[in-house]
A protein has these predicted regions:
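Short phosphate/oxyanion-binding micro-motifs
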Residues: 1-121
Length: 121
């Protein structure tokens, strides 16, 4: 099992999509957690490119203002999904490895950048 956590500092330019696609193919990634995406939505072709054409399952949280945003994708051919939950600052996926049956939680967290939101984080 291989995966990455990456603070993308915005996910709009083609170079970042190419980097993620190449990395996903080269390292054969099974999960991708991107933080600070700055995006409210993604189209299927973008998601397909990020994971190098694999059939990933995706979940995301919108940014708060100009900062934040989380995108989390996993390969369902490697993991059985128990549940997906979202909070204001995290996405949590409960899953089980198909190979050995090990159960675990994958959690992507991105805290508030603005002082007025830090208390709720």
């Amino acid at each position: 099992m291989k995966g990455i956590f990456w603070n993308s500092r915005g996910l709009r330019d083609l170079a970042k999509f190419r980097f993620l696609s190449d990395l996903s193919k080269e390292k054969n990634l099974d999960f991708i957690a991107l933080l600070e995406t700055g995006r409210k939505n993604f189209i299927d072709t973008e998601l397909n490119n990020i994971c190098g054409g694999k059939n990933f399952l995706w979940s995301w949280i919108d940014p708060k203002g100009r900062s934040g945003g989380i995108l989390l994708g996993i390969n369902p051919s490697v993991f059985c999904i128990g549940f997906i939950s979202q909070g204001d600052y995290h996405i949590k996926i409960r899953m089980r490895n198909k190979v050995d049956g090990f159960q675990w939680n994958l959690i992507a967290v991105y805290g508030a950048a603005q002082a007025e939101h830090k208390k709720s984080f």
